[in-house]
Structures are given as C-alpha cells and as structure tokens.
C-alpha cells in the first residue's frame, strides 16, 4: 500500500493514472473496525484500485471534546487497510484540507436538518464539505459508505446527484458484533458495564414494537434516548450510555 502524506504528491500521482482504471474510494476518520474493512473489501472486488483516507475531520464535530478525544490509531489503521485490499491511503493535514479556513461549505437544508442534523447542528455541513473535497482530490469511480450512518449515506447520494458528480455511491450493510450492536469506533470507549447496556440497546431497538415502547424500555435501563424515529421505511435511533453516543438504524 502506498501512503501519501502530502496532497500535492497525491494529486501528481492521481493525474498519472490511466483514465481507463476504476478507483474505489472509502474515506475514514481512522480508529478502524470490521465495518471499515467490509468497505475496503467491497471496493477491492469491484475496482482496479482502492483508495482510502485517514483524516479526523474537525468540522463535523459539534462538540470540541469529541474531536479532542477521538482515538488516533494510525499504525493499526494502516495495517487493517493493508490487510483488506487498500492500494493507496491519503493522510492529509488540516491546513492542507482547509486552505480556505472552512469559509466554503456544502449545506443541505432538508434532510440535513432532521434527526442527526437536529441534534448535532453543523455536523452534516462538515461531513458534506469534507466528502466533496475528498471526492475532488480522489476522483473515484465509486465511493463506498456503510448503512450504519444511513442519513449520511442519503445526504451524500443526494449531493452527488444534485451537483452532477460522476461518482457511483455504493452502500454496504451495517456490520454488527455478535450481540447485534453495530460496529462503531465509539464502542471502544465503553466500559465493561456500559458494553452490557449497549448490547441490550441493540436487542431492544430491533424488537417489533412501537418507537414509544422501545424508548420506554431503553430509558428503564438508564439509557438516554435522543430520538427514535421512522423515516423512509427505516427506524433510526440515537442514544447515550453515559457520555458515549451511539446511533443505529434498520429497515422495517
């Protein structure tokens, strides 16, 4: 796997590649897990080359403490990429990415105001802006995103369509732990007792009951429910276990 620490080096290399070659792209913020690995493997099966990126994007954190405490596990992340078919990895720094000081932003004013957008103001502006920048740098044929962040997936699909970007967005199923808990970088921050509660969250959330009944059961376990909502035939949830925020969704 080739690693690019400098964006100008990457741009020169990207421009040297034949336009006949397909590039799959799976952007990440690091602290990788089995869900990320599934994106890399899907891309490597369908493209000549697979590209990933490691960049903890400050503009999508509405809570500065979350950004500060986001785990940086670069060596382990690069190893996981190497083992799962990534050919090129870009590791840009913040000054390279935000040469404009975040003066220019991508904003969506409908879906981006619901659920995650309502509870995390500015989050999706940061997500869409960084994804747009990375798309322009990588120029992928296809880009791969997990269904765990389904609202994000819909917004990226919408952005690509609205802005006439010649990129195919591929969705990959949520990868879950044995308990049914969705794989997430945040799971690593759970204490053993919180992990047990998180496993119960996954089981209760997937019950064939009303959102109100599910909320009541979760709250009885001491879980803070931010929202449980149904949208476009899926059920979405965001909860807090202690100070760890978890999200999930599934097709009804």
UniProtKB/Swiss-Prot annotation:
Annotated catalysed reactions: (R)-pantoate + beta-alanine + ATP = (R)-pantothenate + AMP + diphosphate + H(+)
Pfam families in the record: Pantoate_ligase
Location relative to the cell: Cytoplasm
Lineage top rank: taxon: Bacteria
Binding site for ATP: 29-36, 146-149, 175, 183-186
Binding sites annotated in the UniProt record for beta-alanine: 60
GO molecular function, one term: ATP binding
EC numbers: 6.3.2.1
Enzyme active site: 36
Record has Cytoplasm as a keyword: yes
GO biological process: pantothenate biosynthetic process
Keywords, alphabetical: ATP-binding, Cytoplasm, Ligase, Nucleotide-binding, Pantothenate biosynthesis
Record's GO cellular component terms: cytosol
Enzyme class: ligase
Chain sites annotated for binding (R)-pantoate: 60, 152
Principal location class: cytoplasm
Pathway noted in the entry: Cofactor biosynthesis; (R)-pantothenate biosynthesis; (R)-pantothenate from (R)-pantoate and beta-alanine: step 1/1
Known role: Catalyzes the condensation of pantoate with beta-alanine in an ATP-dependent reaction via a pantoyl-adenylate intermediate.
HAMAP family to which the protein is assigned, alphabetical: PanC (MF_00158)
Oligomeric and partner information: Homodimer.
Family: Belongs to the pantothenate synthetase family.
Other comments on record: The reaction proceeds by a bi uni uni bi ping pong mechanism.
Full protein name: Pantothenate synthetase
Organism: Legionella pneumophila (strain Paris)
Gene that this polypeptide is encoded by: panC
């Amino acid at each position: 796997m080739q690693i690019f620490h400098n964006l100008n080096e990457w741009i020169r290399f990207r421009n040297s590649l034949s336009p006949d070659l397909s590039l799959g792209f799976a952007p990440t913020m690091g602290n990788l897990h089995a869900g990320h690995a599934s994106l890399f493997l899907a891309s490597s099966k369908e493209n000549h080359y697979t590209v990933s990126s490691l960049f903890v994007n400050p503009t999508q954190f509405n809570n500065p403490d979350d950004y500060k405490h986001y785990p940086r596990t670069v060596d382990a992340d690069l190893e996981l990429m190497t083992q799962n078919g990534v050919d090129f990895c870009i590791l840009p720094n913040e000054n390279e990415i935000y040469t404009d000081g975040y003066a220019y932003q991508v904003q969506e004013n409908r879906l981006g105001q619901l659920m995650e957008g309502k509870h995390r103001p500015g989050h999706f502006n940061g997500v869409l802006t960084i994804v747009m920048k990375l798309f322009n740098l990588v120029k992928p044929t296809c880009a791969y995103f997990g269904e765990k962040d389904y609202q994000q997936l819909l917004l990226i699909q919408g952005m690509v369509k609205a802005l006439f970007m010649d990129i195919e967005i591929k969705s990959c199923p949520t990868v879950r732990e044995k308990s049914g808990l969705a794989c997430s970088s945040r799971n690593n921050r759970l204490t053993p007792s919180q992990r047990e509660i998180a496993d119960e969250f996954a089981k209760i959330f997937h019950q064939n009951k009303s959102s109100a009944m599910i909320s009541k059961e979760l709250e009885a376990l001491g879980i803070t429910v931010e929202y449980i909502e149904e949208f476009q035939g899926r059920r979405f949830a965001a909860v807090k276990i202690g100070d760890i925020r978890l999200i999930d969704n599934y097709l009804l």
